[in-house]
Amino acid sequence: MLNGNLRGKRPRVVAFCLPLLYALSQPLLAQTAPRYVVTDLGSLGGIECAATALNDKGQVVGGADTAKHGKGPENITNVFVWQGGRMRAVPGLDGGHAYVVSVNGAGQMVGAYSADPLKAKFAAALFGPTGKVKLLGGFPATQHGYSLSQAQAINAKGQAVGVSNNQAFLWSQGRLRKLAPPPGFQTSQAWSVSDTGQAAGKGDRSVGSAVRTHAMLWAVGGKVLDLGVLPGYTDSIGRAINSKGQVAGWVGVTRGTSGRRITLHYQAFLWQNGHMRGLGSIPRIPDSKASALNDKGQVVGNAYFKTDEAALLWQNGRVYELNALVPPHSGWKLQNALAINSRGQITGNGIHNGIRRGFLLTPRP
């Protein structure tokens, strides 16, 4: 009778345990580390390449060495667009000096341009996919008689943000508008603009002989919000913003006067709905910075200490070193992640078989 009762109850025990085991396994499955395919972006006939930005089509932009010209020992760096395994030089930029730091889905790029042979007078510029240059202008000239400006980001609407003569700006439909910092802040800089028109950046103010920097968020109408700092930190910078209004950047502990500032420690942060939280770093490297985020809340950046540097991903409350998420023995040391798109692709820079190169990481299915 005893054996018979046991046989009759076994199916019930199994039926109860299976859903329990399945439920318990879900958090573990959800925390499985992502994996990536890594692609070397190559160069334009030279040796080195530096990626700066990425759009949702998988286009990467930056600067790459061309073949050596004449008797000079150095290569010439040219703006490039990489897509689908092919890198091409952006035409129309040979007559001047240019660099790009952001690209939107239409292939419009922003950065700075100078026709000065000595590269002394850079101006904020928008570059079309075919290389057409449009200067965005700047605020009143400096004491040197010209205006210095640089565009830092462009959104899907073609709006650009940046800095001119230490003042943040928004460029939209051919007009340049100042993004003023809060009262008490003397200078500002905009680093990122979302597709909704919000901008993130920083403002600087004097506190005695020191300068304090705070992350800023500018709403669509121009209203500015000081995001503050985390407890124990003195400064912060808003480096990226997404369409949900989340801001990523870093906080720091800074000492010294305005003439000589030393930052002792950095930590990446994510700000959302009035709350800033530190994202931490990896165990062997204490300092971290966040450079970009997408609308899914995935954040990328890097950790660094002295000569050690590693590209990072923050996702679902965890931090990952990207070097651990690519195939082993790939020959790569991924040092910095600078952009992430809606597909989860990541671009940045590192060392590949001893050569400095840009990379593209594509999530494995």
Where are these regions (language model features)?
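N-terminal secretory signal peptides that target proteins for export/translocation
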Residues: 1-11
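Bacterial N-terminal signal peptides
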Residues: 14-27
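General helical structural elements
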Residues: 11-16, 361
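Residue-level hotspots at or immediately adjacent to binding/recognition sites across diverse folds
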Residues: 29-365
